[in-house]
Amino acid sequence: MTLLALGINHKTAPVDLRERVTFSPETLDQALESLLAQPMVQGGVVLSTCNRTELYLSVEEQDNLQEALIRWLCNYHGLNEEDLRKSLYWHQDNDAVSHLMRVASGLDSLVLGEPQILGQVKKAFADSSRGHLNVSELERMFQKSFSVAKRVRTETDIGASAVSVAFAACTLARQIFESLSSVTVLLVGAGETIELVARHLREHHVRKMVIANRTRERAQALADEVGAEVIALSDIDERLKEADIIISSTASPLPIIGKGMVERALKARRNQPMLLVDIAVPRDVEPEVGKLANAYLYSVDDLQNIIQHNLAQRKAAAVQAESIVEQETSEFMAWLRAQSASETIREYRSQSEQVREELTAKALAALEQGGDAQEIMQDLARKLTNRLIHAPTKSLQQAARDGDDERLHILRNSLGLE
């Protein structure tokens, strides 16, 4: 039995190829059934995200194994083998285990240390467990990868610092306000970055979210998801005084929030502080706002500085995380080898039991026929000894004939002679 990991990701393949190799949730069961129908495949898990498609397999070793699996993948997706082959990576046993642990821990992600991948790996495992896993070693490998990912999160700072603009904006808000559960947040825009910000804020249970956008329809869809109120851009001047935090990201060519607007809001708030995070280019907030007392303005450049600092911290944490993965991989492979030995021990014990039962039955039959008990017992002991030492004796003789001192030493050691 061999463990394999093969696939493509954001580092080896462009998005147009990754799109063609993806497995949709609707066709996953069919794909797994087709994969398990291959004679060499014992069990499998398919991980398919926007940044990677990977097959984790337990297989029987055979000639042209790699060719057969690549051919299946290409045939299933209607791809040219050469197009896929140059982007495909292939890991076996130790390397396959290490790769899965790195993936689950976020060490192989586009954004180093991002936590979402662990949930995606768990879902892939759960989906594939519906009748497609079949192999305890494969299941154990995934369960181990989950515990390793948790250990990496617990023992390192790999996920402690923000490395995306959206996450950095939310982290900044949490640093300035002791608790977000008592603040009102005004989000200006409804694009991808604001969507991510809104979801982050929802996870931290902000008291109230208001979304201001040029088109109500797009903002309403996001508002329905995160439980926010929608207003028009023209309403910002009137509603700004309610906001403790303003995060803005639009495509407007001119600033949306001016110095005078913020001055009026601060006056109405009796100078309670306001945090303004402008992640738009061109800027949505007039730079002069940053000169106002109690108005704390951060631009996208400020966030990028935070991100670069945090990314350096994550890279340092990744070194520690890689050490954890190396250690855990070694321990898992030791367990896997022990499983192989356990099966051999079971087979050897079963074989010995069969010999014992066979010879004991013959001895009992001889006793029932009135044979001499002492002779029968001596005959049983002699035959049992000869049968049990026959195979080791042949191996010792063959090692001696071959002049293989190392094998002879191993055999002597295993028989307790050294």
Curated annotation (Swiss-Prot):
The active site is at C50. Pfam families: GlutR_dimer (PF00745), GlutR_N (PF05201), Shikimate_DH (PF01488). Pathway: Porphyrin-containing compound metabolism; protoporphyrin-IX biosynthesis; 5-aminolevulinate from L-glutamyl-tRNA(Glu): step 1/2. InterPro entries: 4pyrrol_synth_GluRdtase, 4pyrrol_synth_GluRdtase_dimer, 4pyrrol_synth_GluRdtase_N, GluRdtase_CS, GluRdtase_dimer_dom_sf, GluRdtase_N_sf, NAD(P)-bd_dom_sf, Shikm_DH/Glu-tRNA_Rdtase. Its EC number is 1.2.1.70. It is an enzyme of class 1 (oxidoreductase). GO terms for biological process: protoporphyrinogen IX biosynthetic process from glutamate. It catalyses: (S)-4-amino-5-oxopentanoate + tRNA(Glu) + NADP(+) = L-glutamyl-tRNA(Glu) + NADPH + H(+). NADP(+) binds at G189, A190, G191, E192, T193, I194. The keyword Oxidoreductase applies. CDD domains: NAD_bind_Glutamyl_tRNA_reduct. GO terms for molecular function: glutamyl-tRNA reductase activity; NADP binding. NCBIfam families: hemA. Possesses an unusual extended V-shaped dimeric structure with each monomer consisting of three distinct domains arranged along a curved 'spinal' alpha-helix. The N-terminal catalytic domain specifically recognizes the glutamate moiety of the substrate. The second domain is the NADPH-binding domain, and the third C-terminal domain is responsible for dimerization. Catalyzes the NADPH-dependent reduction of glutamyl-tRNA(Glu) to glutamate 1-semialdehyde (GSA). HAMAP family: Glu_tRNA_reductase. This is Glutamyl-tRNA reductase. It comes from Klebsiella pneumoniae (strain 342). The lineage of its organism: Bacteria, Pseudomonadati, Pseudomonadota, Gammaproteobacteria, Enterobacterales.
